[in-house]
Amino acid sequence: MSLKRLAIANLLGAATALLMASSAMAAGETLTISGFGGNLQKDLRATLWQPAADAAGVTLSEETQDGLASVRVQVQSGSPTWDIVHLGADECAVGGKEGLFEPLDYKVIKTDGFDKKAYGDHWIATNTYSVVLAWRTDVYKDKHPTSWKDFWDVKAFPGRRALSTYPQEMMEIALLGAGVSKDKLYPLDTKLSLEKLKEIKPDISVWWSSGAQSAQLLKDKEVDMMAIWGSRVASVIKDGAPVEFTYDNGILGYGCLAILKGSTHVAAAQKFIAGVVSPEIQARIPEMMPYYGPTNSLAFKVGKFSPEVLAKSNMSPENVAKQTFIDANWWRDNNELVREDYSLLISN
Amino acid sequence: MTTVAADLLPPNAGVLNAGLLGGDERRQRLAMFGLSVPALVLVALVLLVPFSWLAWLSFFDASGALSGENYARLLRPAYVNSFLSTLQVSAAVTAICILLGYPVAYLLSQLPQRVAQVLLVFIILPFWTSVLVRTYAWLVLLQREGVINTWLKQLGLISESLPLVNNLTGTIIGMVHVMLPFLILPLYSSMRAIDPVYLRAAANCGASPAQSFRQVFLPLSAPGLGAGAALTFVLCLGFYLTPALLGGGRVAMWSTQIADAVSKFANWGAASALSVALLVVTGIILWAMKWAVRRLGSSLGEG
């Protein structure tokens, strides 16, 4: 009887000690990060966020955001429950302009190896994605399209096409199709771009609005060529569909991190972000998230990659040279106007 | 109940215990009101309060200043066109639903109750399947390399695939499928309620089957048809999922604009103004339809 009681007391003691230990660890600081959810967030956590949190000595808790509107609600409440948010670069830029974010401390966060367009006072890009030209190889057997100019050339390359319902990247693509050189894209010539889109509109069978939809269109041969995210086309090819794509003339967009105004863990968040963009952690992207890329080009100096990995990564020195970066600040200032013209063009 | 009882009593009896009856009636009314309080509170909480807040939001621009900007925006061509195409799509879907649904409801109402109940299961069955699943099923059926186009090509009826989806055609097919039960069910129940004696009486008076249908059955089923059509039309006005998936981005429904304003542009003021406009127009249409159905019912009854 007494032996049994002793055993129970021991067990309780051990449990208490364990509990205390774990609460002491959590006491470090807990950062709440809110992202797009789904597979992307899972991959980002495994690749970037968890190692950065470990390095900064913080515990990470995850939420999902529903666009800039949800961030605005958080900040307006006065005491946001999120500390850090992962958004698209233009949303970061708009949020920065609206004063939703704390300024980033660039004494803590190092930007060596960053493109100038890839960070702002209040945000920094942490991963890139590419919008690329992809086509069905069973439709274009002998001669396949190689550039956005070919996408616009319906005589040489007849077939059904698809673009996105989001004007972003599509406006750039239209200008590339018009023959504007990729280093002279910004500020976008919206008039010319919309004219080119109007010209191709009769041959656009579908304006896609989600990544899953875009992949399905190509996989089921609903369209013959399209503008699509690199990560999505990669999964279509992996599924065995006769599809190819090129990084030539691709548009590079960013995902970015920003700290919510009113967060009570600003210093820890700065340290965490510094970790996320460090070359060492960025160098994990090419292998763990193929078809996405590091925003810090030093990642390719730090990491050693096989030629296959380099060929897939949208940010490998060879591939990045073929593409052009999106200008988040231009979109920040012009988004709403362009969007209305664009949706008017699609639906009429 | 009390009024009926009062009618049955001799005329002077009502005067004798009028005070008693009146008190009874008041108590009963109070009890009825008391019973409906929870429902009223629920409606106020989940409907009126959020809607008032929404309407309030619509008067502020993105920076938080009071302005009519969100409503002025609605006059831009992109929104006007989207509004018109929403009305067109809704009207087309409602019309097709009536053409397809009326004969079905008529057939069901003329069958023996037991048979009709079995057949009704087929109409209600889609209700138990998610709209998303049904919409994707249409995508599989209608797309260029889909089941229908493949069959038609194998049968040699067509050489090139028909554009059945990612356009207006696909949107309307998908929406009709989802909406049909909403038309058939109220219509069926109103047709069931029509006493067959009326039709026999019409036949006895020398009316041909077509005449008795047109002059007796149709006017009597008009309220049910009106209710079904109004329900279908109004649900179409706010329909988001099916047009978004089957329209290929080329069918700009009003609901898409609301979703865009919130999710793409984080502009709650604009989204609120769009929603308020939709609600007001829906209210006007419902009222007009009610009026039209009443007119239709009485004019057909007279003619």
List where the protein language model places each region:
Chain A
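A ligand-binding cleft/hinge motif common to bilobed small-molecule-binding domains
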Residues: 90-96, 219, 224-242
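Ligand-binding "clamshell"
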Residues: 95-103, 115-121, 235-247, 308-311
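Periplasmic-binding protein-like
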Residues: 129-131, 191-200, 237-263, 304-308
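A bilobed periplasmic-binding-protein/Venus flytrap-type ligand-binding module shared by bacterial periplasmic
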Residues: 132-139, 175-180, 254-266, 273, ...
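Mature extracytoplasmic/periplasmic domains
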Residues: 260-320
